[in-house]
């Protein structure tokens, strides 16, 4: 009963959050931040959290130089946490591993979060960001979940002017990619 009550509480919280995001009632607190500092802080937190769960974590920053991004730090952290939470939920290897890579792709930075979990079938992959979509395997598992976590992630990334997608190989793992536009100062002509 306790576990079911917790699951219901989580579902209510996710539905409330999704409703606020969907109706543009969530207040975003955008700030200009250093991409390097922000993602290194995220990586430090993930390293501790995943280490406590005996899951390997590798962080790599491939950006040649630091740049600024305009983000809501709390909401972007929610994106990363939701993706990592999904990876952990469906991790089926005794030696779980999660990777986080930051890359420079023109006017954007690209964040890649990969795992060595069970992967997602090609049939299900196009729908994983749809509201309430759950794969047949997750519906039949004891893993729980509401089917709105990744739709929340997609909405937040899009509200940041970005895009999100995934690649996956069954039995080998999944990688989620999202891009966030770099901050660029526009010179003012005098």
Short names for language-model regions:
Residues 161-162:
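Conserved glycine-rich
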Residues 87-88:
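Short helix-loop "hinge" at the ATP-lid/N-box region of the Bergerat-fold HATPase_c
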Residues 3-8:
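Short alpha-helical segment of the dimerization/phosphotransfer core of two-component systems
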Residues 23-28, 66-71:
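Conserved micro-motifs of the catalytic ATP-binding
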Residues 29-47, 102:
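A conserved beta-strand-to-alpha-helix junction within the catalytic ATP-binding
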Residues 49-60:
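Short conserved segments within the C-terminal catalytic ATPase subdomain
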Residues 120-132:
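Short conserved segment of the HATPase_c
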């Amino acid at each position: 009963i306790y576990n079911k009550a917790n699951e219901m509480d989580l579902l209510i919280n996710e539905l409330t959050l999704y409703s606020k995001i969907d109706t543009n009632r969530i207040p975003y607190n955008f700030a200009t931040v250093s991409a390097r500092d922000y993602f290194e802080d995220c990586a430090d937190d993930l390293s501790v959290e995943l280490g406590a769960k005996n899951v390997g974590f590798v962080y790599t920053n491939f950006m040649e130089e630091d740049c600024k991004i305009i983000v809501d730090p709390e909401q972007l952290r929610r994106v990363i946490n939701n993706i990592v939470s999904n990876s952990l939920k469906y991790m089926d290897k005794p030696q779980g591993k999660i990777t986080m890579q930051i890359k420079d792709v023109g006017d954007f930075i690209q964040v890649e979060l990969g795992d060595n979990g069970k992967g997602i079938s090609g049939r299900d992959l196009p729908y994983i960001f749809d509201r309430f979509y759950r794969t047949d395997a997750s519906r039949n598992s004891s893993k729980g979940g509401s089917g709105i976590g990744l739709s929340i992630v997609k909405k937040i990334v899009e509200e940041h002017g970005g895009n999100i997608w995934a690649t996956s190989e069954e039995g080998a793992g999944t990688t989620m990619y999202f891009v966030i536009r770099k901050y660029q100062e526009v010179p003012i002509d005098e």
